[in-house]
Amino acid sequence: MISQQSAKHIENQWLALEIGNSRLHWALFMGESLEFTWDTEYLPESVIQQLGNGETKLEVGSEEKEIFFTFFPLPPAPCPLPLFIASVVPQQTVLWENYLNVRVITLDQIPLNNIYPTLGIDRALALWGAGMSWGFPVLVIDAGTALTFTAADGGKNLVGGAILPGVGLQFASLGQQTGQLPQVEMEAIKSLPPRFALNTTEAIQSGVIYTLIAGMRDFTEEWLSLFPDGKVAIKGGDRILLLNYLQALYPDLAARLIVEPNLIFWGMQTIVAGVA
């Protein structure tokens, strides 16, 4: 039997799901409050069906995994929490269409001006979340599978941005698409490599890291020259790694960056508040 207090918690709860290029990123909200976040690998269709039935202890292979335990009681089946999705992987989006209480957030729901049709929903939501949290104008750096720069001016107009391979993707492409270059693992890099390296592994590290940091510096300085009072926020799985390198090389510039991994979720929250 669910108490009135628990029922109130349940009524205000909803899930946000960002379907990224390599993983699923989750958030549990209590109304407008972000309670906590977690990541999972892509889930099998059978597990998605269990979630859609309101189950929280999921059978994944031979193991029972409590993927969706929370600090608040979850509703019993068949009443799954409302689920709002932002996806950059259409094949994954389709798998969630049978979830009983799902809404997919689309570009036309984001109140940015000058959006072009192929702008990634992740970039748009992160930009909107940053602007609504810290104000416009704002530049968002997303250090994920791709390293992206996305900016909006004080009138909430999309200024534009840029996309390039992220640090892991650059290492992987050199290791996989060349005949003799080794695969460099990011975990093996403990500090900045020598800029002029005397072995192949460190030469790859130097080339990738210093050019990425130079790109971050160039885009950030150009942005701040256009909008001296503008904000710069960084998110993404490699944010700490790249921010540490930027701090070591350009500490004054690094100090201008706002580190916030949940920009997309904050963007989703403002959209959900308007449609729920």
Curated annotation (Swiss-Prot):
Record-annotated membrane-spanning stretches: none
Compartmental location: Cytoplasm
Recorded metabolic or biological pathway in which this protein acts: Cofactor biosynthesis; coenzyme A biosynthesis; CoA from (R)-pantothenate: step 1/5
Positions that bind K(+): 142
UniProt similarity note: Belongs to the type III pantothenate kinase family.
Role of this protein: Catalyzes the phosphorylation of pantothenate (Pan), the first step in CoA biosynthesis.
The protein's assembly and partners: Homodimer.
Name of the molecule in the record: Type III pantothenate kinase
Gene giving rise to this polypeptide: coaX
